Amino acid sequence: MNEPAYERIASSCERIEIDFSKEEMANLAVIHNMPEQSIEDIATVFSYLEERKNQTIIDTCIKLSRLPKKEPKTFEGFDFSRIHGQDIERLTSLSSLSPLYSRKNLAFIGPQGVGKTHLAMAFGRKCCEAGMKTYFLKATELNQKMTYARKFGKIDSLVKNMVKPSCLIIDEVGRCIFDEYNTNLFFDIVDRRSIKEGPNCMIFTSNKNPKDWENYFIEKDSLLGAMDRFFNDALVFMIKGESYRGRKTETISLQAGNTTPVVSTK
């Protein structure tokens, strides 16, 4: 008997949600007098179906995440050689997704162009590759969605959509002002995510120090409550330095004018 093949078949069936046990496969093999190679071939087929389903899940997660697909931001594509510090390994190890599984939030704080959004997107993409639902949006977009939801009576739907993903990324906090009602909604989202079960991570990026966020959220008590819940268990990366942007820019100096003298005829 080829027990490993039966185990692989049962494992693949479980992952693709087919009710078919290794005992059933063994019984079928006996009834039809299947040779060992046939059982291995069946295991290969189920393994392929499992891989195909996994890829479909990943593709769907990426599609719904709003992360870039043409030029994806990945950890492999990030220049870690430009980042220095005593605890750099805390940053380089993010690809393990340990914050997601330990239910720890992430914040990337620093000036423009140091890689905050790239790192947040890279983490989100890793979540997608692990089959975890991820959603990316800018703080300005969230603010607009809140205002729209209030206008058309879709607040419950909006909050549920923000709580549902395992990983929610809000980029560029401090680029817009949330009015009193939207600040309350912001608190509601953070509060519900803080008690959400299962793998869970919320990511903020910002050019502003968190102590200055009160300038961008009108309702101070709700903001304080949201920040208290978010930073209760979070990894905060304060990144200093010059912008990465413009590294590929080439400056070419040219001069306009006639290259040959103009001959005057009278």
How should each PLM-predicted stretch be described?
Residues 1-23:
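Charged, compositionally biased N-terminal leader segments and the immediate start
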Residues 18-70:
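Interdomain "pre-motor" coupling segment immediately N-terminal to P-loop NTPase/helicase cores
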Residues 73-97:
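N-terminal pre-Walker A segment at the start of P-loop NTPase domains
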Residues 103-119:
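Walker A/P-loop nucleotide-binding motif
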Residues 105-107, 167, 201:
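Residue-level preference for the first positions of well-ordered beta-strands
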Residues 125-137:
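Post-Walker A helix-loop "phosphate-sensing" segment adjacent to the P-loop in P-loop NTPases
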